[in-house]
Amino acid sequence: MTTVTPELLTVPEVMARLKVGRSKVYDLIRTRRLASIKIDGARRVPTDAVRDFIQDQLGEAI
């Protein structure tokens, strides 16, 4: 059986991809618009969650 491990991004990496500040990323996480997990106290965001967030934003823009 093959297990696919999702690529996880740090908050600064998400900031760079979305071109937003740290507080905006945490706001998106807090409001559950951006999925995330904690690993030993460190916040990580799956790349799929960032992609899904961007797709949702594009859908709202149309």
UniProtKB/Swiss-Prot annotation:
Keyword RNA-binding: no
Coiled coil (UniProt feature): none
GO molecular function: DNA binding
Entry superkingdom: Bacteria
Pfam family, one: HTH_17
Record key words, sorted: DNA recombination, DNA-binding, Plasmid, Viral genome excision
Gene Ontology BP annotations: DNA recombination; provirus excision
Protein name: Excisionase
The species this protein was found in: Streptomyces ambofaciens
